[in-house]
């Protein structure tokens, strides 16, 4: 079996073949995910909340992401691994490159950055230096203090138009992938149709090219803070983790998940 690459994701978009992705933080789970058919994994700064117990992603450091990227890579050597760049590690292009290089050396295939068109020069700089970039728009958790909490984004016409413009700017700058979080389904479809690069949704309906879930949400172990867009696949699978992961991948690929009750308008 050959490694999964961004070329595979582009081909899947052209073929309208939906794909599932999930967060991973260690070798055991990344191996299990790959064995159950998930070929794309994100070492997310969500680990600040799910693994470290913080109330936001802001305390996560590059060293944290490096460590978990190394673990995930060992467990799934053929997966396409995305690694988050933590809060305040990409304020300037120069700072971004040194931080991104650490993640790539740790085993990442691509780095993910949160932000709109202001990031375009940074995305261009990284791409020119052979660092693939995944953008992240909509509800960007590192901006929680600006948003005043975890809220749906892009509901007004002006906000929706700005988000679409940001997505196009990131693609033009060289981004090869985009995560779209907590936006209305209609806006998610506009963005997905407008971009030639694959779009991965989370809380964006079933109209995007792929889906991602935080693994703890997919297993129903997030506690009282389970988001509306999440589904407990572990409960639906009788407590069998492997079956739960397989069901998640299957429902995404068949367009069953996310359903209407997991979507925003």
Curated annotation (Swiss-Prot):
Gene3D superfamilies with a match to the protein in the record: Phosphoenolpyruvate-binding domains (3.20.20.60)
InterPro entries on file: Pantoate_hydroxy_MeTrfase (IPR003700), Pyrv/PenolPyrv_kinase-like_dom (IPR015813), Pyrv_kinase-like_dom_sf (IPR040442)
EC category: transferase
GO CC field: cytoplasm
Role noted for this protein: Catalyzes the reversible reaction in which hydroxymethyl group from 5,10-methylenetetrahydrofolate is transferred onto alpha-ketoisovalerate to form ketopantoate.
Subunit structure: Homodecamer; pentamer of dimers.
Protein name listed in UniProt: 3-methyl-2-oxobutanoate hydroxymethyltransferase
Protein's organism: Pectobacterium carotovorum subsp. carotovorum (strain PC1)
